[in-house]
């Protein structure tokens, strides 16, 4: 009840009271800022952890950790931090400047309908999007099953034998197919045929990839190509970019006679109606699953696919999910054939792909699960029938259709009709068409197209709202009969998606429960911290994620006119400027759509720079032994020769060895690839000297930005001496890992390298003759998820970003300090401190207790934790990165788990516990192993299942026991097994 006495009696008094209350409200708002939501430890926690480390303040810690010569002494020039509400409102304003037209541009991108049950329960669900790549398969069976469904879907639709678990985009997949063909072809040719009917972005990405490898690209007509020059491979579009469906069998037979491999870039939805590539002789099929319920997003992210013959299984790029079994004989899934991946094969790898598009592959697979084979076919038939209607009506209006065999795309000759007149009418109807040339336009229909949309398109060409025809049943039936797809050689006769998983979950209730069952099999950030070194598994805040699903960002075609994408342009300009400020670089490209692609792009820019100066001989890339495996793989892709540089006993680059190698290769030195802080988790004091050595020999310094979470606001790559740096936005800038993608890997470059940044054939900016060409299918890569990083920077501001870096370093040092008495910290920087991660040395445990690194990783699952990075960068170690988002309580739980495990090992060392039959060797423990049959082990069920107090409050149960990796590789299966195999 309000007392009258409390009401101000004068206007002055009222004014002062209102002012005070407003100030109070502002103070409350400040207390509720996003920075405190993002950073896990409270102020009291931070002080307590500093006390443990013996420091009075965070600044004191940073002063002792980061070399003074490289520290940034000025605040970053970034916008002031905004609340979540204010940031969302500001971004909504920007989004409103995008215009959502009906886009019938095609070229591999189509509007689609994301089933609400998939959007809400996968795309918007942190249980799916905050997980990591399934390197610990026992706690990743859910998304591994979803990815196996994806692979099965692709195998069935393409008619090939094996498929991987996604690639970055269709153009990149085509480039990977070219590289694989080059590697396995035995005819020694170095020319690759590219059909001129491929999408322009595919052709451009292939040209970019081919140039440094010395591959000659021959662009031509497959119908007239006479094979006068030997080729090792070819790529064909199916259907062609202009919509035409060709019979490619004769071309493929002739190619095979030469020993060449043929890749078909195929639209997977069309394959529900068309003869699959595998059935007419294709060796490889690639494409995009974007139209399987994944929003356009102005170019991405989308899951590409890659399918081929089983004989090439060890040459396939990217990850493959395979079927194996666990220790109890139960069917279990894992990543198969991992020894072919870049992090193991390094410079011998044929691909540098690491992060792919797992989250989007899961969505696409569930789209197929939800609709089933009949549902997909109905969608495809409906699109095709509407395209037939459109074609007939346009012909009746006097226009010429260039092809009589098509699925969803038409090209129309305008005749005497001016192109500008068509475009102005289309704009009035808020419709986008593909401009092929001054007298030709293209139209691609999609799942969202209605008959009324078709009428609107016809009104554009008729020049009037009144159409001279009506569609009745008889007319419709007659038009459908005109389809060439019902006849050989185009009509698909083989069945597909016959596995029960594609025929069981067609009601929303059933799919919802299936998705939830899979989700609960996986450990994500919704369960506990994921302390993977070099992975930065920080908070992916809900406010950062929400805009991804806004229509203003999601329904924009990547080749829509720039006049319709003002909002995106503002977003890009701001983000490029902020990332440039954070890194100290003059220019930024947002096109690379993964960290691996950022590396590749950065090195291509360096290569192009040297060539522009007439120094084509510069092709040696120095890489420390400790580098990420993608580094040497990327260098080889850029036509460079890798020369390894040694590390000293402290884990730092051996500067004497670096100087010797730089001197030896001075004439041909192109670049040094260096990670900072180092992959050993320390700030190397000699980093500026290292950069100076390379520059003195005419080389450029490429800095791997994987560890940028320890630099933001404290030091900058450009100031340190780097010429190029890629950023993992899915690490430092909060884009979630998605269980193995999406990622984004933009690069920052010094001013002298700006002219060489990527271009794109569909944009005016792509016509700069100095640029390296396109490295991704879309001009700004996976544009729609850039809103996540934009939101993070806006809500954190300069102070918040810097504080996050400091706390990330604090958390890592706190863990190192707490665990040092139990596990030696392998490398430390100056003053005995680590950067944002630390390496714990477990090598002695093999000798003392017969304990392998894997035993500790699997036992951590029983405690409810994902293992840190295992056996990298040093075999027999674990690398821990807690990030700034984890609270002190969570750090303490993790430390207590590792300390308890060390005690279990001590019991083995003391002979109290059997060296073979113990809680580590048998980990992880499933519910079934605990309750079914006799308990044969010398330790209790309680110790197995509830080794720590918090596991009684909330227990994460692995769905399978330890998986037999070797069995899965010996008995390679990468598609769904019969359902009884899971029982």
From Swiss-Prot:
One example of a Gene Ontology biological process annotation: glycine decarboxylation via glycine cleavage system
Pfam families listed in its UniProt record: GcvP2_C (PF21478), GDC-P (PF02347)
InterPro entries in alphabetical order: GcvP, GDC-P_C, GDC-P_N, GDC_P, PyrdxlP-dep_Trfase, PyrdxlP-dep_Trfase_major, PyrdxlP-dep_Trfase_small
E.C. no: 1.4.4.2
Keyword Transcription regulation among UniProt keywords: no
Gene3D superfamilies cross-referenced by the UniProt entry: Aspartate Aminotransferase, domain 1, Type I PLP-dependent aspartate aminotransferase-like (Major domain)
GO cellular component, one term: cytosol
Cofactor(s) this protein cannot do without: pyridoxal 5'-phosphate
UniProt catalytic activity: N(6)-[(R)-lipoyl]-L-lysyl-[glycine-cleavage complex H protein] + glycine + H(+) = N(6)-[(R)-S(8)-aminomethyldihydrolipoyl]-L-lysyl-[glycine-cleavage complex H protein] + CO2
The organism's place on the tree of life at top rank: Bacteria
Modification type N6-(pyridoxal phosphate)lysine: residues: 731
Family from the record: Belongs to the GcvP family.
Function: The glycine cleavage system catalyzes the degradation of glycine. The P protein binds the alpha-amino group of glycine through its pyridoxal phosphate cofactor; CO(2) is released and the remaining methylamine moiety is then transferred to the lipoamide cofactor of the H protein.
Protein known as: Glycine dehydrogenase (decarboxylating)
